[in-house]
Amino acid sequence: MVQKIKAFLSQESSGGILLMLAVAMAMLLANSPLAGLYQGFLDTPVQVRFGQLDINKPLLLWVNDGLMALFFLLIGLEVKRELVEGALSSVSKASLPTFAAIGGMVFPALVYLGFNFGNEATQNGWAIPAATDIAFALGVLALLGNRVPVALKVFLLALAIIDDIGVIVIIALFYSSDLSITSLVIAAIAIGSMVILNLKGVRTLTPYALLGLLLWIAVLKSGVHATLAGVVIAFCIPLKVKPGEESPSRYLEHSLHPWSTFMILPLFAFANAGLSLSGMSLASLAEPAALGVMLGLLLGKPLGVLLFSYAAVKLKWASLPQGVNWQQISAVAVLCGVGFTMSIFISSLAFEHSAVDVGNYARLGTLVGSMLSASIAYFWLTKVLNDDKGETDENKNS
């Protein structure tokens, strides 16, 4: 039994499967006689006091502001590594996924605004369909096994990382509330201290962890969303070291990855995906927020990714990865419409102070759009890869 669990956890698809199970469990509880218990659990107040410092939030916000800061720390570490020595370390490597990611953010936002522009209650959610859930998307890709070209996986990963950078910028610029200058000054001091530690060659993680905690608290109190602290911390932690030394950034990334995959993201999905369908029907998908998010993910994402990629290649600003064709790019473009945890997260920011119905409709659009995108992409990519394999076998026999 233990061996079977270890084998499951070692599979690339395990993270995506756990996310699906977490979403299913949340939906089941939210629409069962246990709905009150589920909501009460999320509303449980959790208070931390240390002298004059007082942080008092419901459990749901500890998940969204605290655990997701660790997730964004992991994203920051991955982005930094890819920028320095990975899939984004040169113009030639980064050009195609960069154009694809830009298109994949612009088009969904335009589709959403097409249904919600001028609607004060809903137009603030324009960024919801701009996000891609990389864990879920890679999980779907992993279900296809070794048939998926490595270059196609790298393209999706690079695209999603650039997409994450875009989401980080969007959160910082558009979803920050009234700012506290005192807290921002403390945050700046913490950042400056970590930069100095890096420049002085300090490779021990403990001082970065202590200053990172101070930064998270300061950002939490500043009005800027606390998850951004994770990204800043990641960029301050040293990546390059002398030969024979262990990279603190790589060590932390490796250590955080299983926690993110098997605890943070499933817990976030469980806490945020519990949408009560009471009073909802198929007609609810026609609500502006639901329709904008659903079609933004289902149509806007693939159109943006594909059109911007095609234009970049035709204009010779980028080139297709070796061994990858347009059919495969098209299927992956649809897969980018899997927004799930990232879209739900942005929804929680966009409609934090709005009527409950608006946030619920946005989550409904996210769940339906993401599931349809994942299903279509899986079957499309299966067909494309089978066709490619058939052509390869024919060429070998001829």
UniProtKB/Swiss-Prot annotation:
Transcription as UniProt keyword: no
Name of a matching Pfam family: Na_H_antiport_1
GO (cellular component) term, any one: plasma membrane
GO molecular function, one term: sodium:proton antiporter activity
Transmembrane segments: 17-37, 59-79, 95-115, 125-145, 154-174, 179-199, 213-233, 262-282, 288-308, 331-351, 364-384
Gene3D superfamilies found in the cross-reference section: Na+/H+ antiporter like domain
Protein localization: Cell inner membrane
Superkingdom of this protein's organism: Bacteria
Topological type in the membrane: Multi-pass membrane protein
Catalytic activity reported: Na(+)(in) + 2 H(+)(out) = Na(+)(out) + 2 H(+)(in)
Keywords: Antiport, Cell inner membrane, Cell membrane, Ion transport, Membrane, Sodium, Sodium transport, Transmembrane, Transmembrane helix, Transport
Gene Ontology BP term (one): regulation of pH
InterPro entries listed in its UniProt record: Na/H_antiporter_dom_sf, NhaA
Keyword Cytoplasm included in the entry's annotation: no
Protein family: Belongs to the NhaA Na(+)/H(+) (TC 2.A.33) antiporter family.
Function: Na(+)/H(+) antiporter that extrudes sodium in exchange for external protons.
PANTHER family per record: NA(+)_H(+) ANTIPORTER NHAA, SODIUM ION/PROTON ANTIPORTER NHAA-RELATED
Protein name (database record): Na(+)/H(+) antiporter NhaA 2
Organism annotation: Shewanella denitrificans (strain OS217 / ATCC BAA-1090 / DSM 15013)
High-level lineage: Bacteria, Pseudomonadati, Pseudomonadota, Gammaproteobacteria, Alteromonadales
